[in-house]
Amino acid sequence: MPASVTPSITGLLLAGGRATRMDGADKGLQLLDGTPLALHVLRRLAGQVDEMVISANRNADRYAELGAPFGARVVPDETLDFAGPLAGLLAGMRAARAPLVVCAPCDTPSLPTDLVARLHAAFDAHRADIAMAVTVDAQHARSPQPTFALLRTSLADDLAAALAAGERKVRAWYARHKTVEVEFRDERAFYNANSWQELAALARR
């Protein structure tokens, strides 16, 4: 294992959303510079972790093909109603072989190559349950990035109970646990493609 890889962490690519602002298209499979968005993310995240898991509720064969070079496994949500990122997070936590999981959405092709190291450093320093990325712009405005986070997989049962009780908001569930915020100054690294317009904007950068 390379020295740059943080030990005992599973990487989780979140690709199980409904993508309503893309007319239901599978975001992770949309092309940026001729390459699926999900593959951009896999290439940047896989080198920072011990193993990769992909949360996907459709096109599992295609995601398995994209993930094969990284040894990634594809897992669906435990529910069939597209319950959002918390459901994908739960699926990944259940599938993880490591005690920690770090998640990232499938439509953020420029995510930081030091994402895991920085989240893990704060996680350890604060003895936290969750470390969440927060971007800070030139005007010092802070924007939480809850789908970029490092979590203990031992929280899976608590998350399952929260989902069963109807919780769908990621930050609301994080607030139940000891969460540390980790500042990132390059907000461009977290740009995503929630719509066709945002995908076109990414292509112009």
UniProtKB/Swiss-Prot annotation:
Keywords: Cytoplasm, GTP-binding, Magnesium, Metal-binding, Molybdenum cofactor biosynthesis, Nucleotide-binding, Transferase. One of its GO terms (cellular component) is cytoplasm. GO terms for biological process: bis(molybdopterin guanine dinucleotide)molybdenum biosynthetic process. Mg(2+) binds at residue 107. Transfers a GMP moiety from GTP to Mo-molybdopterin (Mo-MPT) cofactor (Moco or molybdenum cofactor) to form Mo-molybdopterin guanine dinucleotide (Mo-MGD) cofactor. PANTHER family: MOLYBDENUM COFACTOR GUANYLYLTRANSFERASE. The N-terminal domain determines nucleotide recognition and specific binding, while the C-terminal domain determines the specific binding to the target protein. This is Molybdenum cofactor guanylyltransferase. The lineage of its organism: Bacteria, Pseudomonadati, Pseudomonadota, Betaproteobacteria, Burkholderiales. The gene is mobA.
